[in-house]
Regions:
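Hydrophobic face of amphipathic alpha-helices that form TPR/SEL1-like repeat modules
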Residues: 15-19, 47-54, 83-90, 121-128, ...
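Structural signature of tandem alpha-helical TPR/SEL1-like repeats
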Residues: 24-28, 59-67, 94-105, 132-137, ...
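Short helix-capping/linker turns of helical repeat alpha-solenoids
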Residues: 24-25, 38-42, 54-56, 75-78, ...
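Alpha-helical segment of the N-proximal tetratricopeptide repeat
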Residues: 11-39, 113, 118
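Terminal, low-structured helical/coil segments at or just beyond the last alpha-helical repeat
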Residues: 93-113, 152-185
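Classical Sec-dependent N-terminal signal peptides that target proteins to the secretory pathway
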Residues: 1-7
Length: 185
């Protein structure tokens, strides 16, 4: 399937969800929204995060709202940062760390299912959302992203590469090769 038709299909699905919600078929709409979110559709994730935050159509669920909002942010939805800022008032550091771990595991599973966006999202977690930044793993995932044909990851990979020493770089490259094979198996 060409990626264009897949993107078109997701847009269609999101449109169906809006229609279901307008027709007050909330349960079905929310279920479909969850399915699309689990397919790493960042537009669906942002909407789902907002709904879980507001509690208008389903009970409030701040942890899941953070999970989906964070995934959308990592996928490039900058608007998600607004919801995450609000959620920071209700969640403690430990909860956020746990959510980040769960999200990384979710994205790794997606990456092994050949989801290219997930590969970059994982790299961003390691680079920007671990304390201290885990540059070995960030490089590993950016390196895989570039090898998978994601051109936008090249500058990030090279940037992280310049902050690694020789040993760490070799370790990261070995890990990249191993994970790349696992993804493309």
């Amino acid at each position: 399937i060409p990626s264009y038709s897949l993107a078109n299909e997701k847009k269609q699905n999101l449109q169906n969800i809006y229609t279901l919600l307008q027709e007050k078929k909330f349960e079905e709409g929310i279920k479909n929204l969850q399915v699309l979110s689990e397919q790493n559709d960042i537009n669906a994730q942002l909407l789902y995060s907002k709904i879980l935050f507001s509690g208008d159509l389903t009970p409030q669920d701040f942890e899941n709202s953070y999970f989906w909002g964070f995934s959308a942010l990592l996928g490039g939805k900058k608007k998600a940062s607004n919801i995450l800022e609000k959620l920071n008032e209700y969640l403690n550091e430990e909860q956020i760390r746990d959510i980040t771990t769960k999200l990384r595991e979710f994205l790794e599973k997606r990456a092994y299912e050949k989801d290219k966006r997930a590969i970059v999202q994982i790299a961003k977690i390691y680079e920007n959302f671990t304390e201290p930044p885990d540059l070995i793993n960030a490089y590993t995932w950016y390196n895989i992203a570039v090898a998978q044909g994601i051109k936008t990851a090249k500058s990030k990979r090279d940037e992280v590469l310049n902050s690694l020493n020789e040993k760490d770089l070799l370790d990261a490259q070995s890990l990249s090769i191993k994970l790349f094979k696992k993804i493309n198996n």
